[in-house]
């Protein structure tokens, strides 16, 4: 029956109990034998004699091993040997998150009249964009020294790529590559601010509506400002027209620069045209959804949401020689001939730089 046996003697029933300590003794003997056999394969710190006490030789071996590892890592104690590296990295992340939450909850941050929130920008937006900048598009920047360290300046760049990744990469390039780590304030189409979540994030990143009045206010305040004069004509052009600049509007950006005496810096971006190669624009669907264009690319809409992932083209951003406006008269901002000539000069500079960058490119994805 497993626990005992029952005997019947002349009508009397007696139970013979089998002592369990007999089996326990046998099991313990087998375990001790196994320990002696496997002991040679265990770490010295796990070895012990039958009475559970470590020998002096075993303890000395463990101490020597710890001392050797401590000397090789430069640690001063056992805690540093075992936990310092992983915990310091984890502690940095925890401290960063805790610091961000504390400042947001206590209101210990500032927002300017345009909605620019430097604290949110540095903690959330820029770290997210750096993955695309460094690992996905592998952006190379040249001519960053042409941007002033202080004071207002207007960066004028070509626009392409269906979605405005070029503006995001340009703003990050200025902050991360410029010695002064300046904030670049983009002039953005008003439709963007009507988008849920996106519009609020764009304002927190320091950008504002693309209009002459806002451009004038930013430049007059000494802000580094960027404009894409091609607008939707450049952003939504077909792949066959890549790197061919579209018309630069009516020259409103030149008027703002002339009236504030701000320096104009031409900027050429190569790589943005290939992230969403637009084969055609379905205008009927664009009108139906109320958007400037409805792109058809090799992956969108055929691949569904996967088609929204930009292709990892190799990018180059080149800042050209600055064009100074200090020698222009105050009335030149209202002179159509002056604004037209200056607009054409900026446009031609960007176009020729694009041709030069393309001539030195061997591969779309590897540069």
Curated annotation (Swiss-Prot):
GO molecular function, one term: acyltransferase activity
Family: To M.tuberculosis Rv0502.
Entry protein name: Uncharacterized protein ML2427
The organism's place on the tree of life at top rank: Bacteria
Listed SUPFAM superfamilies: Glycerol-3-phosphate (1)-acyltransferase
GO cellular component, one term: membrane
The organism of origin for this protein: Mycobacterium leprae (strain TN)
InterPro entries in UniProt: P_lipid/glycerol_AcTrfase_prd, Plipid/glycerol_acylTrfase
């Amino acid at each position: 029956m497993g626990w005992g046996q029952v005997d019947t003697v002349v009508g009397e029933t007696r139970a013979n109990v089998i002592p369990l300590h007999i089996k326990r003794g046998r099991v313990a003997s087998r375990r001790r034998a196994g320990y002696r056999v496997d002991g040679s394969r265990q770490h010295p710190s796990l070895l012990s004699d039958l009475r559970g006490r470590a020998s002096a030789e075993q303890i000395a071996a463990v101490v020597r091993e710890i001392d050797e590892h401590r000397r090789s890592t430069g640690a001063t104690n056992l805690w540093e040997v075992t936990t310092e590296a992983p915990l310091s990295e984890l502690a940095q992340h925890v401290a960063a998150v805790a610091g961000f939450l504390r400042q947001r909850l206590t209101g210990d941050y500032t927002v300017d009249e345009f909605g620019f929130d430097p604290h949110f920008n540095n903690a959330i937006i820029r770290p997210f964009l750096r993955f695309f900048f460094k690992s996905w598009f592998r952006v190379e920047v040249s001519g960053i020294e042409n941007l002033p360290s202080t004071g207002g300046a207007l960066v004028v760049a070509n626009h392409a790529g269906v979605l405005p990744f070029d503006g995001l990469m340009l703003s990050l390039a200025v902050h991360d590559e410029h010695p002064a780590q300046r904030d670049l304030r983009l002039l953005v189409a008003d439709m963007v601010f009507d988008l849920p979540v996106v519009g609020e994030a764009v304002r927190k990143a320091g950008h504002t509506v693309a209009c002459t009045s806002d451009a004038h206010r930013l430049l007059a305040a000494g802000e580094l400002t960027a404009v894409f004069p091609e607008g939707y004509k450049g952003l939504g052009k077909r792949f066959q027209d890549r790197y061919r600049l579209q018309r630069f509007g009516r020259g409103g950006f030149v008027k703002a620069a002339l009236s504030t005496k701000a320096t104009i810096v031409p900027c050429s971006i190569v790589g943005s045209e290939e992230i969403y190669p637009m084969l055609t624009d379905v205008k009927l669907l664009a009108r139906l959804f109320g958007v400037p264009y409805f792109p058809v690319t090799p992956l969108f809409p055929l691949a569904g949401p996967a088609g929204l992932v930009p292709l990892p083209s190799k990018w180059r951003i080149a800042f050209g020689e600055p064009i100074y406006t200090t020698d222009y008269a105050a009335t030149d901002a209202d002179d159509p001939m002056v604004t037209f000539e200056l607009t054409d000069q900026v446009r031609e500079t960007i176009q020729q730089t694009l041709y030069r960058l393309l001539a030195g490119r061997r591969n779309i994805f590897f540069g």
